[in-house]
Curated annotation (Swiss-Prot):
InterPro entries: PCRF, Pep_chain_release_fac_I, Pep_chain_release_fac_I_sf, PrfB. Residues 1-21 form a transit peptide. This is Peptide chain release factor PrfB2, chloroplastic. Pfam families: PCRF, RF-1. Keywords: Chloroplast, Plastid, Protein biosynthesis, Transit peptide. One of its GO terms (molecular function) is translation release factor activity, codon specific. It is found in: Plastid, Chloroplast stroma. The lineage of its organism: Eukaryota, Viridiplantae, Streptophyta, Embryophyta, Tracheophyta.
Length: 482
C-alpha cells in the first residue's frame, strides 16, 4: 500500500518501469496534470499505473503508510526502523523539520497564525520530543536490542527473551510514532503548497485545519515524551496521609484525596478506593486509591511530597488562620511477572479486624478488614473497602507487593528516603506545594516556582500544569544538552 501526491514536474525518474515526477513523487499522465489525493493505493497490477487512483483529496487523516521520502528518494517499510529513523524526511522542495526551525518563522497564537506559524510550532514540538526521548541513544539501544533478538539462543532464557522483546516493542512504538508525526507535518506542507498552485481553496482550507489539529496534538505528544522511565506506563496507588493537627489536617487530607480522584477521572483513569481511615470528626487520617490507566504513575509521581494548606479554619469558631499538612505517596503497580521482591508466607503477619466507618444499618459487623505486616521490613498494607475478607486480603497483598517493589527500586537507586514508608516528618521543611486560600489566593509549586491564582480549579483536579512543569524541570536537570 502506498500513498502519493501525483502531479506534473520537470524532474523525472523511473520506479519499477513507471515514470514518476514531482518534487516529491508523481505519475505522468499524457493528457494533463493529475492531482492524486492522499488516498491509499493498491499495488494490484490490473489497475492503471499499478492501481494508482486519481481524484481530489478525500480524507486528510489518512497517511503515507511507512514511506519516508527526501528529494528524489524514499524508503519503504521493508527497511529496518533504525535505518528509517536516520533518514531525513523532507517535503518536495527539500524542507525538513530542522530547516523549518532554522527559518525562525514566527510562532503566533493558534487563531492568528498562518500555515508557517503552525508548521513552526509543530516542528519545535518535534524537536523537543526528540530531545526528551534522547533520540540518538534510542537508535543505539534499538540496534543492540535488534542484535539480541536475532540471536539463535535467545529463547533459551524465556524471561530474558520476553524482557528484550517488550523493550524492543516499546522503543519501536515510540520511534515510529515520532517519525509518522514528522512525515505527516511535511505531507501537510506539501499539500498546502500544491493547493495554492492549483488555486484549490477547498483543499487549502482542509489541509490548514488538519495542520491546526496537529498543532494541538503536538503539545500532548510533548507531555508524553516526558514519560520515558521504565515504570511510567504503569498504573499506581496514590496514598494520602494527614499531618499533625487533628481535624483540620484530616479535612485537608480528604480535600487532597478528592483532588486526585477528580484529576484521575478527568484523565479517563479508573479509580478504586483501597483503604480509608476516617477522621474522628471530619476528613480522613489516611487513604489509598488505585488508579488504573496508561501512564498513571508517570503523571502522578510528580505529586509525591508534602502539601501545605493556609486558610481560615471552618472548625475554628474564632475564624483564625490555620496551616495544615498532608503527605502524598505514589507507588507504581508493576505488570504481571515484573515484581522485584518475592514474598514468603512465613514473613507475613495477617491481622483481621472490623471495618471502620460512619456505621448505621450498612455497617460491616464482621471482621472483614485485613492488615498485612511484612515482618522483615515492617511495611504494612491495609484494606477494608471490600465486603469480604478474601477480597480485602487480595487487595492488601497487591498493595504490599507494590510497596516492597518500590522499596527495592529505591534501594537499588539509593533513594530510600523517597519511599512511602520512609516519608520524613510531615511539616514545614518537606513541602513541595503551598495552597493559600487566605489572605490571598494562590497555589505555588516550590520545586519549579510554577503558580496559579485560582486554587479552586486546582482543588477540582486541574493539575496538569504543575505536573508538566515538574516533569520538564526534572528532565532538564538530567539533560546535558539543555
Amino acid at each position: 500500500m502506498l500513498s502519493l501526491i501525483i502531479r506534473r514536474s520537470r524532474s523525472r525518474f523511473i520506479i519499477h518501469g513507471i515514470k514518476i515526477s514531482c518534487n516529491s513523487l508523481s505519475a505522468v499522465d499524457s493528457s494533463s496534470s493529475v492531482l492524486v489525493s492522499r488516498r491509499t493505493f493498491s499495488s494490484t497490477p490490473a489497475l492503471s499505473y499499478f492501481g494508482f487512483n486519481y481524484g481530489k483529496i478525500s480524507n486528510l487523516n489518512q497517511r503515507f503508510g511507512n514511506y519516508a521520502y527526501s528529494g528524489s528518494s524514499f524508503a519503504s517499510s521493508t527497511r529496518s526502523l533504525s535505518s528509517e529513523a536516520v533518514a531525513v524526511a523532507a517535503t518536495c522542495d527539500g524542507l525538513t523539520v530542522e530547516r523549518i526551525i532554522a527559518n525562525q518563522w514566527p510562532i503566533l497564537d493558534e487563531n492568528e497564525g498562518d500555515w508557517k506559524s503552525h508548521a513552526a510550532a509543530i516542528a519545535q514540538s518535534i524537536q523537543v520530543i526528540k530531545r526528551r526521548l534522547q533520540w540518538k541513544k534510542l537508535l543505539v539501544r534499538l540496534k543492540v536490542l535488534s542484535a539480541e533478538l536475532n540471536k539463535s539462543d535467545l529463547w533459551d532464557d524465556p524471561t530474558h527473551a520476553g524482557k528484550i522483546s517488550r523493550e524492543h516493542g516499546s522503543l519501536t512504538g515510540k520511534m515510529k510514532g515520532v517519525m509518522t508525526f514528522e512525515r505527516e507535518l511535511l505531507e501537510h506542507i506539501d499539500m498546502l503548497k500544491l493547493a495554492k498552485e492549483e488555486n484549490d481553496s477547498e483543499l487549502e482550507s482542509e489541509t490548514l485545519k488538519a495542520l491546526i489539529d496537529m498543532r494541538r496534538v503536538s503539545k500532548e505528544k510533548e507531555l508524553e515524551a516526558l514519560l520515558s522511565a521504565d515504570n511510567d506506563p504503569c498504573s499506581c496507588y496514590i496514598e494520602v496521609q494527614a499531618g499533625a493537627g487533628g481535624t483540620e489536617s484530616n479535612d485537608w487530607a480528604a480535600m487532597v484525596m478528592e483532588m486526585y480522584k477528580t484529576w484521575a477521572q478527568r484523565r479517563k483513569f479508573s479509580v478504586t478506593v483501597v483503604d480509608e481511615a476516617p477522621g474522628e470528626i471530619a476528613g480522613i487520617k489516611r487513604a489509598t486509591i488505585k488508579v488504573n490507566g496508561e501512564y498513571a504513575y508517570g503523571y502522578a509521581k510528580a505529586e509525591v511530597g508534602v502539601h501545605r494548606l493556609v486558610r481560615i479554619s471552618p472548625f475554628d469558631s474564632g475564624k483564625r488562620r490555620h496551616t495544615s499538612f498532608a503527605a502524598v505517596a505514589v507507588i507504581p503497580i508493576l505488570g504481571d511477572g515484573s515484581t522485584r521482591v518475592e514474598i514468603n508466607d512465613s514473613d507475613l503477619r495477617i491481622e483481621r479486624f472490623r471495618s471502620g466507618g460512619a456505621g448505621g444499618q450498612h455497617a460491616n459487623t464482621t471482621d472483614s478488614a485485613v492488615r498485612i505486616v511484612h515482618i522483615p521490613t515492617g511495611i504494612t498494607a491495609t484494606c477494608q473497602n471490600e465486603r469480604s475478607q478474601h477480597s480485602n486480603k487480595a487487595s492488601a497483598m497487591a498493595v504490599l507487593q507494590s510497596r516492597l517493589d518500590q522499596l527495592e527500586m529505591a534501594r537499588q537507586t539509593a533513594m530510600n528516603a523517597q519511599h512511602t514508608q520512609s516519608l520524613t516528618e510531615i511539616s514545614w521543611g518537606n513541602q513541595i506545594r503551598t495552597y493559600v486560600l487566605h489572605p490571598y489566593r494562590m497555589v505555588k509549586d516550590l520545586r519549579t516556582n510554577y503558580e496559579v491564582s485560582d486554587p479552586d480549579s486546582v482543588l477540582e483536579g486541574d493539575l496538569d500544569g504543575f505536573i508538566l512543569s515538574f516533569l520538564s524541570s526534572s528532565l532538564d536537570k538530567d539533560d546535558p544538552e539543555h
